[in-house]
Curated annotation (Swiss-Prot):
Domain notes: The Asp-Asp-Xaa-Xaa-Asp/Glu (DDXXD/E) motif is important for the catalytic activity, presumably through binding to Mg(2+).
Cofactor (UniProt): Mg(2+); Mn(2+)
Organism from which the protein derives: Zea mays
CDD domains: Terpene_cyclase_plant_C1 (cd00684)
UniProt record similarity statement: Belongs to the terpene synthase family.
Taxon lineage: Eukaryota, Viridiplantae, Streptophyta, Embryophyta, Tracheophyta
EC number: 4.2.3.197
Enzyme class: lyase
Protein name, entry field: Eudesmanediol synthase
Length: 557
């Protein structure tokens, strides 16, 4: 979970509203409860019927056998960036097999196509050697200076592709440094036109492999029509699909807002963050496709409940109350509610009742997933208690101790399991076992979350209670200044992304659904903590993005 950046309360009853130490109220209130989308049910039905016709036409046009490799690479990338790939998974899978098996002809498509092929294959778990970039390097090993200004699209593709590096790939370190420097220079001089200029600016903030796919789709649909070789069929389908998926998201957000309002008003914990809209934005950044509706609902509801528990441990409960809350969670039985202080009893009862509802929703052959879910939730409470003990004792952990605990308190292992609970048959028992064991990839995803979070806290000058974050812990242990320690944590963050990349290409493909959840959660965190903000705790920082993604009418039909 995101850290609670306010001072601990020591009373045993909720604080009176109005103190400087409280979180700001929701910037949305009940807006999405009453919001009426401009798309009517009837027009939505017509759009859906039109979209189905267009999908059939795309299937006919998508002839992998007749396209050359460069054309296939471009077509697959276009489908993915337009948010259409989930409708053509089998066709894309066949195309990727051919793209991986066939080499590009010499200088086929230039740097742009070579880099695009490299990125696509690695993102889909297919190994590609960095040797493909040798043709664009000089004898001394550096990249050719001729790439500086005459191929901005190629430089951008190289920059994005290089962020699929695995640990130790010096060639891609050089590629990132080279391309970033040239792209910054191009932008500062205004040497590139729209839409490439916007795409460069976006990538310099967050490289494409780490950017949330739904936001990229929102931007790219508006940009795609300005490309000379754009496909009108794909553009129309992408616009329809975006509006239809948004309509589904708005229905889900309304349902979640109603659910959250009832929960938040029932448990009466005014010290806790009221952030369901931000949670749902986070959810869509992780999984936006229609088929993951149940997974989104499980994720958002659980995130909301664990956030209430997190804030209780962090900013309000006494240490004795923390022990009692942890103990009640371990027992997982409504009859144990009496061990809790009065103000926490409704939170406990509502948590258990919501988990019962989750189980009732699951199909009989998927109910085994609840055991993993409950254990993960219980483990969260154990680790929150450990943080509370450290804070109470003013304990200065070693960096290793802090890292080990924060992997679990990041919430990513538990939330990955909760998300997979809403998947279909592609989420196997082996996937639940794998995530529950917290393997290296889950650890790396958790560390991406924690390091982004702690870099934000350092820049904001705030931390959980008086608990040191990873920046402060690293600084003390290594005798560094704060900025030096922050730079070291940023380097560790980059390394963890590379571990995520490496695991995608090495892991058993039956685990790829779980792998993708971990990667997508890390992607969503890049947006939440962009430029050192904490847009979950400080919801106003996310308001413009929420407005654009869910409300702004930017797509003519």
């Amino acid at each position: 979970m995101a850290p609670s950046n306010i001072v601990v309360q020591s009373s045993s009853t909720p604080p009176v509203a109005g103190g400087d130490e409280e979180f700001a109220p929701s910037v949305w209130g009940d807006f999405f409860v009453t919001y009426a989308p401009p798309v009517s049910q009837a027009s939505e039905q017509r759009m859906s019927e039109r979209a189905e016709l267009l999908k059939a036409q795309v299937c006919q046009a998508f002839d992998a056998a007749s396209m050359d490799v460069a054309g296939l690479v471009t077509y697959v990338d276009t489908l993915e960036r337009l948010g259409l790939d989930n409708h053509f998974r089998d066709l894309i899978g066949a195309a990727l097999e051919r793209i991986g098996a066939e080499e590009l002809p010499e200088h086929g498509g230039g740097l742009h196509i070579v880099a695009l092929r490299f990125r696509l294959l690695r993102q889909h778990g297919i190994w590609v050697s960095t040797d493909v970039f040798d043709a664009f390097r000089e004898d001394a090993g550096g990249f050719c200076s001729s790439l500086c200004s005459d191929d901005p699209r190629g430089l951008l593709s190289l920059y994005n592709a290089a962020h699929m590096a695995v640990p130790g790939e010096v060639v891609l370190d050089d590629a990132i440094a080279f391309a970033r420097g040239r792209l910054l220079d191009i932008i500062s001089k205004g040497e590139v036109r729209s839409p490439v200029s916007e795409q460069i600016t976006r990538a310099l903030d967050i490289p494409l492999p780490r950017f949330t796919r739904r936001l990229e789709t929102m931007h790219y649909i508006a940009e795609y029509e300005h490309e000379e070789a754009h496909d009108g069929l794909l553009l129309e389908l992408a616009r329809l699909n975006f509006v239809l998926v948004r309509a589904l998201h708005l229905r889900e957000l309304k349902d979640l807002s109603l659910w959250w309002r009832e929960l938040y008003n029932t448990v009466k914990l005014p010290y806790a963050r009221d952030r369901m809209v931000e949670i749902y934005f986070w959810t869509c950044g992780m999984l936006h496709e229609e088929e993951y509706s149940l997974a989104r609902m499980f994720f958002a509801k659980t995130f909301g409940m664990v956030s209430l528990m997190d804030d209780t441990f962090d900013v309000h409960a006494t240490l004795d109350e923390c022990h009692k809350l942890k103990e009640a969670m371990q027992r997982w039985d409504e009859s144990e509610v009496s061990i809790l202080p009065e103000y926490l009893r409704l939170l406990y009862i509502k948590t258990l009742s919501n988990f019962k509802e989750f189980e009732e929703i699951l199909e009989p052959n998927k109910k085994y997933r609840m055991a993993y879910t409950k254990e993960a939730y219980k483990l969260c409470s154990k680790n929150y208690l450990k943080e509370a003990i450290w804070s109470n004792q003013k304990y200065q952990p070693s960096f290793k101790e802090h890292e080990e605990l924060s992997i679990m308190t990041s919430g990513l292992p538990m939330l990955t399991i909760l998300t997979l609970m809403g998947f279909g048959d592609e989420a196997t028992p082996e996937a639940f076992e794998w995530v529950s064991s917290v393997p290296e990839m889950v650890r790396a995803g958790s560390q991406v979350t924690r390091f982004l979070n702690d870099l934000s806290s350092y820049k904001l000058g705030k931390n959980k209670k008086d608990m040191p974050g990873s920046v402060e812990t690293y600084m003390v242990e290594n005798g560094l200044t704060g900025d030096e320690a922050a730079a070291a944590i940023a380097a560790l963050l980059e390394n963890r992304w590379r571990i995520l990349n490496q695991t995608r290409m090495e892991i058993d493909h039956t685990l790829l659904p779980a792998v993708q959840v971990v990667v997508n959660m890390a992607r969503a965190n890049e947006i939440i903590y962009l430029h050192g903000r904490d847009a979950y705790t400080f919801g106003a920082d996310l308001k413009d993005l929420v407005t654009t993604l869910f409300l702004k009418q930017v797509l003519p039909l």
